[in-house]
């Protein structure tokens, strides 16, 4: 039996920490297959990142991943709450003839915001970084 959806944190000798993420049916429900594979791949990576980081929250709360750019992909939003409910949204400006465009053309001049809101009375945390390179990972 192969599990379709799982998030498993692991640690090896207090040196290496990581998370194994597999979201087959969950990602399929979120991703709209009308977009080309390169766009869906970026969206799937965003969903996996959200599941990996958000699954480590200890209290009631929400972890959100927000990417904004001036490229073809305008917005990616994914959030995960403490009940392991995940949802996502992607906004693509024009998805005609973009199948072979590289990451840098799909997301250009981009910003990534990672937000943690834990509980009603806890302080909210936000990290902002410029999106550079050839991948959202």
Question: Which role fits each region the language model picked out?
Answer:
Residues 137:
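Cys/His-clustered metal-coordination modules, chiefly Zn-binding fingers
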């Amino acid at each position: 039996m192969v599990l379709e959806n799982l998030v498993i944190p692991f640690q090896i000798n207090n040196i290496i920490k990581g998370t194994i993420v597999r979201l087959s049916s969950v990602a399929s429900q979120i991703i709209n297959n009308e977009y080309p594979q390169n766009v869906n791949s970026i969206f799937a990576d965003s969903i996996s990142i959200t599941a990996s980081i958000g699954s480590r929250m200890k209290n009631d709360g929400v972890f959100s991943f927000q990417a904004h750019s001036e490229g073809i992909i305008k917005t990616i939003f994914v959030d995960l709450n403490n009940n392991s409910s995940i949802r996502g949204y992607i906004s693509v400006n024009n998805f005609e003839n973009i199948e072979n465009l590289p990451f840098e053309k799909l997301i250009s001049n981009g910003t990534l915001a990672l937000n943690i809101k834990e509980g009603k009375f806890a302080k909210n945390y936000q990290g902002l970084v410029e999106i550079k390179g050839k991948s959202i990972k």
